């Protein structure tokens, strides 16, 4: 009972502890085959801008994967742009509106060793409103043909304490299938997965801040434009 209480307390307090920190951070822990990664970045953008960025990502992940590569998936090497210890080719996604199930399909390549073609991952994609008026997006694994054994992720937008920006909070929990569980050690996880999670959350931050600057510049230009 005591252990269960401590676990619940940890889950409740973890996001608050992340928010309390004044710097961007990412860290991964490993226990019993599961990698848990906590990521946070401060975003100098309004609630509405941050929420719109997340909504755009959510929509494009469901219906227009290719549109994500110039911004949300930029620099993540998900289409074999450069050679690595483990490479990915993220081919496509399809979304079932009735069941809220998102299927992603791609290849996993270990250069010179083996290629696993057309690995699929079926996930339940949901979004729930939070008390601050934003929403948390959840991505939970339903089934996969080998690469991932278990996965649940959450992405939240949390207002900063001074109300002058927001925090993007990404929490990922993943267990790999038997072969990948052997291959992806704690050390390799950082070079295969953790840096991609960091790149992803910074991509969303950069997009939100870029939209903020562009919106401000447009307002300034409109203010100074000649009035007829």
Language model features: what each stretch is:
Residues 55-65, 198-209:
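Sec-exported extracytoplasmic/periplasmic mature domains
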Residues 73-145, 174-177, 199, 203-211, ...:
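Glycine-rich portal/gate segments that line the openings of hydrophobic small-molecule binding cavities
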Residues 20-101:
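Hydrophobic ligand-binding cavity/cleft-lining segments
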Residues 33-34, 82-84, 115-122, 147-154, ...:
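Amphipathic hydrophobic-ligand
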Residues 49-52, 188, 192-195, 199, ...:
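Extracytoplasmic/secreted proteins, especially bacterial periplasmic and envelope-associated proteins
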Residues 66-67, 212-216:
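Surface-exposed patches in mature extracellular/periplasmic domains of secreted proteins
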Residues 127-194:
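Beta-strand/loop substructures that line and gate deep hydrophobic ligand-binding cavities in soluble
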Residues 4-18:
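Sec-dependent N-terminal signal peptides
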């Amino acid at each position: 009972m005591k252990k269960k209480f401590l676990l619940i307390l940890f889950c409740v307090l973890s996001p608050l502890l992340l928010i309390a920190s004044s710097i961007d951070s990412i860290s991964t822990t490993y226990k019993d085959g599961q990698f848990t990664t906590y990521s946070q970045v401060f975003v100098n953008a309004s609630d509405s801008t941050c929420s719109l960025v997340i909504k755009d990502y959510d929509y494009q992940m469901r219906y227009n994967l290719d549109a994500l590569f110039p911004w949300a998936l930029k620099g993540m090497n998900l289409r074999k742009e450069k050679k690595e210890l483990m490479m990915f080719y993220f081919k496509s996604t399809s979304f079932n509106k009735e069941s809220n199930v998102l299927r992603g399909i791609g290849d996993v390549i270990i250069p010179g060793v083996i290629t696993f073609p057309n690995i699929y991952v079926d996930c339940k994609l949901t979004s729930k409103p939070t008390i601050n008026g934003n929403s948390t997006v959840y991505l939970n694994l339903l089934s996969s043909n080998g690469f991932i054994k278990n996965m649940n992720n959450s992405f939240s937008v949390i207002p900063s304490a001074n109300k002058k920006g927001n925090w993007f909070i990404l929490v990922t929990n993943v267990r790999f299938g038997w072969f990948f569980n052997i291959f992806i050690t704690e050390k390799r996880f950082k070079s295969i997965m953790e840096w991609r999670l960091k790149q992803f959350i910074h991509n969303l931050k950069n997009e939100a801040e870029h939209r903020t600057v562009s919106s401000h510049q447009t307002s300034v230009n409109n203010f100074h434009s000649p009035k007829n």
